Amino acid sequence: MQINNQTGLNEWGLFTNSGIKITADEDAEKLMYQAAHYEMVASALVVKMGHEINSEFKIGCMMAMGPTYPATPAPQDVMKAERTMQAGYWLADIQCKGKYPNWLKRYFERHHFALDITEADLNILAVGRTVDYIGFSYYASHVTKTDDYCC
């Protein structure tokens, strides 16, 4: 029996710290985004290599799913829920679409995160190295509400 479905990254998430020891004088959020970028490049290379080994392989990723819903139909709550979902699932955007979402690029600019993202990295992400499927682990749904416009 041959196994053709492979999962490269299992339940990844941005703020797992990727094993990084962060000192008090370092920007933890920036470092975690940088680590996540390297993980995305590594994942894209795994997908590429897997397809080169066997074109029948289906290589995917798996994410912990916890959808967030607005507490009310108020636009502020809807926007907060959308932003919360974006913050939790942007890695899937990169793995499926092969590029960073525009909202995240703007976030990096606003927070002055000059990450080490090279043209070669972007090419690796973009050119035929996206996952074939996404697996989900569902744990719980969440509800969010805000009194202020969040974005």
Where are these regions (language model features)?
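Active-site region of glycoside hydrolase catalytic domains
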Residues: 1-151
